[in-house]
Amino acid sequence: MTAGYEPCWLRYERKDQYSRLRFEEIVAKRTSPIFQAVVEELQKGLRSMMEIEPQVVQEVNETANSIWLGTLEDEEFERPLEGTLVHPEGYVIRSDVDDGPFRIYIIGKTDAGVLYGVFHFLRLLQMGENIAQLSIIEQPKNRLRMINHWDNMDGSIERGYAGRSIFFVDDQFVKQNQRIKDYARLLASVGINAISINNVNVHKTETKLITDHFLPDVAEVADIFRTYGIKTFLSINYASPIEIGGLPTADPLDPEVRRWWKETAKRIYQYIPDFGGFVVKADSEFRPGPFTYGRDHAEGANMLAEALAPFGGLVIWRCFVYNCQQDWRDRTTDRAKAAYDHFKPLDGQFRENVILQIKNGPMDFQVREPVSPLFGAMPKTNQMMEVQITQEYTGQQKHLCFLIPQWKEVLDFDTYAKGKGSEVKKVIDGSLFDYRYSGIAGVSNIGSDPNWTGHTLAQANLYGFGRLAWNPDLSAEEIANEWVVQTFGDDSQVVETISWMLLSSWRIYENYTSPLGVGWMVNPGHHYGPNVDGYEYSHWGTYHYADRDGIGVDRTVATGTGYTAQYFPENAAMYESLDTCPDELLLFFHHVPYTHRLHSGETVIQHIYNTHFEGVEQAKQLRKRWEQLKGKIDEKRYHDVLERLTIQVEHAKEWRDVINTYFYRKSGIDDQYGRKIYR
């Protein structure tokens, strides 16, 4: 940790199995900034893992063991690889040991492809794989693989649990260029190609990021990310024409407003020629937007898209739009329905450089909620998915909660938008409806902490997000194994133990928190710790409706809010009926008596008791398994993780006792096993 922070999974520890393999040359004829970064990374990895310093050459030595780096623009690679690579970021890795010297070829369709290919090769070395017979063709499934930062310019991070911003402090840029470079390396190593650096809730100072005052600083950050194949985006304030433009309105149909945004876009691209575009949170949670002027979201987004289009820029328009002034007495209004109701009628009305960014579920990154019905419901409108890597509702990086299994369930969910086989992953990779732009974004979990993510094991969520964004068909087991070996080494006990901990942790967290998909039950505002009625009588639309007889939200067509009708018929029917609704989502879709029997055979109330007692024991098991690794993990990381796991056990007990006591007092029904409940 020589730089004051960890290298995470790019540790490049020595690998004795390669001690006899001596690469003498790196053949690299290209000199672009990306290529220079590629060569530097390869040299760093070979130096650390194999203790060799191959020369970088442009002219080939026919007798030398070598690694060849190139693109399809290079004459010698164009013909043999013709038609192999379709995606501009794709690459080939091949070994050649047939005639004489040992060669590795890492060939990309573009420089970015070579970058990803080199990181893949270094991953193989870190994993201790046999590199003698490589024949790999890789192409990303998703075009846009993005990280969203919720960093504020005062240095704080909204929903951040890993220190302060690495970009901003005291309303200025930090100028931590080496750390930003190392962050870019981490992101590029898992295939991330886009980043927005400021919070979607754009405050007064951040509104000025699109002005001459801050654009030189934005350009400096963009230069660093560009070197690693990452485009820079900014979150913008929809009211900017008023707040910094001196106009009396931000009406998207006003000619002066449109002119102002066109001039602003032109200015940005003078500083950053490959600027990615804007991320927009509008008409949501008190943020300004087109509704103020009687316009819809298509009119609002298209105005920005028109300004960016001449430069190839994108508008990423968030669909997190709902009534945050709901009357809790009103049982007909349903926050879960809002995104679909707002956006579905606008299908086909958005410009082609607009992408709708849709949260994985209809509510707000809960430990369990159904997949948003908006996925697949707009065949004429670009869509991408938003997940939350930062653990706002899943333990805030004090608790271990590996989110890859959750995201896998979402990606593999069949929408039935074009019949069976219409999974969410096919919607967001653009293949189902031939979207021009699509992809996936994750809200970052990093900050200035030495381990980047607060909880060392939370690094696995950032790593896993990138790997899933590149290839949604990777399994959670594969991703966990890759991360553990690269981060902690290949000792079999270490790999087996930490992989088990990761893969078990989401269900464990779910067990001791809110039951059966009902969500929330957290302290208002900061969202940490149990408070069953914390939001029950608020204006946020996040209710569980527990009374003396039962619990849950009736979202059926027959007797409830009608939310189930937003799904395609196969899923609508599944969720509408108690007979087919999955247990884990029962209380999201139905209000049932505490004595209702789940498909598991347990009653709802007994399930609540059982899972909360079991969850605490499972949290203890996480800590116990980690303690068995003492001496196999360096002291710093061992104690850091142990401290977090101890916190998790204590907080799991609090969750257990609050939830079980609350529902005992509501229902008056005893735990059939007579365990301790505070009456």
Swiss-Prot record:
GO terms for molecular function: alpha-glucuronidase activity; xylan alpha-1,2-glucuronosidase activity. The lineage of its organism: Bacteria, Bacillati, Bacillota, Bacilli, Bacillales. It catalyses: Hydrolysis of (1->2)-alpha-D-(4-O-methyl)glucuronosyl links in the main chain of hardwood xylans. Belongs to the glycosyl hydrolase 67 family. The gene is aguA. The active site is at E285, D364, E392. This is Xylan alpha-(1->2)-glucuronosidase. It comes from the Bacteria. Coiled coil: none annotated.
